[in-house]
Amino acid sequence: MLFRSDYEDGWALARELKVPIVDEHYYQAPGWFINHQDFYDTYERGGTRVYLGEYASHGNGRANTLETALTEAVHMISLERNGDVVAMSSYAPLLAKEGHKNWDPDLIYFDNNNIWPTVGYHVQKLFSNNAGDRYALTKANLLNDGRTFPDNDEFAPFRKRFASSCVIDSKTNIATVKIANLLGFEVKTTLKLDNLVPASVNATKTVLTGDIFSRDAKPDTPESVTLDRTTELTLKPFSLTVLSIPLK
């Protein structure tokens, strides 16, 4: 006998009724987000879309750490890639008052006198402030100590801890490249802008990094960098790098 889940039956009904959008919720361990970057890649196109209304990465003790924040970044990179299916997303829960919490993690904690944004908050802010309406396909070649990580089964555990995306804002004509490195060592990759920019361009780089279990990591001060059409980047261990690039 073939058993179907409520999830499968719900989606089948939504498509049959031509429901415009379905609200999905899930809370998972960091490893789930690392291993399910293709979660929406095989969703049916051109029909019912997804509103990811609640999601969060839950680590040991349900703390909001750099690890959980970076795995959420990896997931949001996959959401950008599948923007034709995922119409919207929102982290949950958002706010929690100390002494009156229903659960952890939450995105922003507060009491009567203080506010404590989490690492996850900073990741969400970097994505929301650097959104786009067009997606540009990306491909990453990874290098560590002169050693290439080929795209095969042997190196799959390494490559799964790395994700990248490029979106373009048509109104501002700015491209944003987001690169998440969940590996515990520096990785070199090459950014090829080809015909998107002139010979060189001044871009803005913001990096969020720190100890993998840090609960108070914050983005570094944005810095101006010069990018050529082909630029080698060194990505810090356990980091999210955001490049804001004005196009020609």
Segments predicted by a language model, with ranges:
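Acidic, Ser/Thr/Pro-rich beta/coil linker or hinge segments at domain junctions
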Residues: 196-237
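Catalytic-core region of carbohydrate-active enzymes that cleave or remodel glycosidic bonds
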Residues: 13-16, 20-130, 184
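Generic recognition of flexible, low-complexity loop/linker segments
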Residues: 8-12, 37-41, 75-79, 112, ...
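Short beta-strand-to-coil "C-cap" segments at the C-terminal boundary of structured domains/repeats
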Residues: 243-248
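Short, small-residue-biased leader/transition segments that mark boundaries at the very start
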Residues: 1-2
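Distinct, well-ordered alpha-helical segments
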Residues: 6-15, 191-193
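Carbohydrate-binding surface patches
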Residues: 157-199, 205, 241
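A structural signal for beta-strand and strand-to-loop patches characteristic of beta-rich domains
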Residues: 116, 120, 126-150
